[in-house]
Amino acid sequence: MTQLTQEAKVVTTPQAVFIGEDTSNFLRAEHAEAGTSRAYEEHARQRRRATPFGASEQNWRRRDKFFEYLRTCAIDSTRARCMTEVFQATEGQPQAIRIARGVARTLAEIPVFIDDDDLFAGNVTGRPMASHIYPELMPDYYTSEAVDWDAVRTQPSPVIITPEDLALLTSIAPYWRGKTIGDRWNELRRADDEALNRHCLYFSYNMLAGIGHVIANIPLVLQRGLAGLREEATRARKKEATARKPDPDRLAFYDSVIISLDGVVRYAQRHAEECGRLAASAGDPTRRLQLERMAEACRRVPEHPPCDTFEALQSALFVLYGLAAESSQISICPGRVDQWLAPFVEHDLATGTPPEAIIELLEAVICKLAHWWTFTGREAAIIDTGNNLCTFTIGGSHADGSDATTVVTEMVLRAYNHMRMAHPPLALRVHKGTPDHVWEAAVRCISNGCGMPSFMNDEVMVSALQDLGFSAEDAHNYADVGCVEMGSTGTSLGPVSIGFINLAKCLELALNDGRCALSKDQLGPRTGRLAEHESFESVRRAYERQLAFAVENFNHSVSALEQAHAELRPVPLLSALTDNAIREGRDLIRGSSKYRYAGIEGIGFAEVADSLTAIKHLVFDEQAVTAEELYDQIQADFPDERLRQRLINRAPKYGNDEDTADAMAAWVCERFVQEVKSHRDYWNSEYSAGAWSIALAMTLGFGVGALPNGRRASQTLTEGIRPASGCDRNGPTSCLKSVARIDHRLFQNGSIFNMTFTPEMLDGDANRRKFSQLLRTFFVMGGFQLQFNVVDAAVLREAKAHPERHRGLIVRVAGYCAYFVNETSHVQDQIIERTCNRAWTGTY
């Protein structure tokens, strides 16, 4: 078979290529011979008849096993042991080489796990669903002193650790003390940084989890293979070694790249051997053929360029698993899947492969990556639940503005619709030229309760990235690298999720002379109590001072953490998969990426906007309540319920197409971005601002006292830029108009807008057309992102009471989806309380 490279032409899919909703009729007429097609259609109908949503029976069996594995997520200490032994044996050697040897040894010793229903080889660890441990970051995070393992075993998403694994982690912890990222950070950061984190003014711990929120440069691997990259690194090393004054750091970098690439190749070869062994003993002829195909692919990729769709996907999986062994951070993403996969799919379709066979492979990849789970310590259940956020991006436009839809775009949507899994996330880029059939397929997927895709507006994000310094070509090549933050394949390294600022806490300090309302500790500058301000502008100035205090201290904290990474934690494998690193002889963490910027996210936009509006409207404009009275009420967490209801119901609220409240929300966003942009990080890189929160809107909300919008102390904050729950009362159109008043181009790191509709609202073609038009109108008005829950609150309450009946119920938590029954009770309640749209217009 002719070998394909990324120079192959990506054929744009014409409209109405796909015939009917039944995926057995998913045919590309110009590629299919009539007799073969009819035979395959009958075969597809037979093997899909027993599955609820159209997935192949084999993939559906694998999905069923996933839910069993989900109850036994485990800790795998293999990597921790390998990394420790390598570091102990290589004292004094360059850090990059030590990291590379540790990763290579891990990939050489992880047990090979292949499920009986797997169509692809590879896994993050040697167990069905388990997490690596990364002692070089913060080893005590995993010991009995730091984690109540008995509690973790009984949480909604239980985590299992064997006595042997726990004993090993405990035994290696002393070696790492004083040598880790966490230790170095503690030496560099300010004395009060821990207190400001603990009081929920900000959350600056993200990079303790390693380097992530990046795009694995799959197109580069498919074009050249790891052997091609190794050859380039070898040539560069030889050139450096023969220079008049060889640079030892560059030589060490090249050595670390070669070691890392060889480690991934050996990892694939081990799977080829195991697949061959299993094939030889397989009793079922069909399974034997599958295993032989897997073995053949593992012998070729990712060392060499793939020959077909199957090998391209297998190569991508091995690269992702290799990167998981190098760095623990979530959101190592495959980028624009429909772009890099299209040449292989087009080739296979042209040579007689039925479209259903391609969709079956995509289903299998979705299921494989759903097993990528990362233990993030004690807070996992309330911060991110271990979701790895290996986001797929599809759709979008080219640099010339033309549509980038390929034959793969709708195939991916249909595969997600078939599998109905919460992970991996799926983002659809849309623009003015997005074909109707793509909109229709995406809306149908949403209407079925998948929670995916999320929708992202090219016109806004391309402009925002160009403002950040991206070329037009690179900006048009953006992809989601997690919840909603953006990167460009092979050219950018964030860290785009460096941490979070709690805007609601800033307001609390502004109203309380810089003191925490809960602990009474003095945290921020003294800006006076609410009753001491004689004008609304004085209140706003106090808020601005507290915001500036928070961002300045946060900047120092995360810059110290960046410095710790630069000194101790190179990423040679990830560096090898970029455009510049091998050419420059410099690791990504040392600044070799074409674009480098750090993302700071704000949390609590709606609470701050509505609280400031309430103060202005009820205290200073109408004088319906005195500043002293309001101050006393929020300090005491609203003993007067009647006053709290006045604040909730009489003051204008963001989300209702009301000028005063919406203008305040726009100001809160603009002021946050201005403050973020006034700082630079350790690398003197520009910050980009975002409005999203993973699940930290709940976590950071615990540390915020009562607010003037009527929110009680320690309640959750609102994620992203959506209006506060229950405050958008005039229907979805008014809500969308309010959100569109914000200048979304300011959020170069993305913003999240969650909406909830009942299933009846999207039932039938007419309602789905209304829904699609609503989305398009929002994007024409300048909105950036939309994502949806399509579920009734009554169903959620039933699922909370009887989780055993609803194991597959998917909900949007923040920028990611999750299985509702696996979330904590607090998260479940927050989702239930969100505004649910039951009508297209009017109060409800």
Predicted regions and their residues:
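Conserved catalytic cores of very large enzyme subunits
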Residues: 4-254, 286, 290-844
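Extended, non-transmembrane alpha-helical coiled-coils
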Residues: 266, 270-273, 277, 293-296
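Core nucleic-acid recognition elements
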Residues: 1
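A conserved hydrophobic secondary-structure block that centers on an alpha-helix together
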Residues: 278-286
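Extended non-globular scaffold/tether segments
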Residues: 255-266, 271
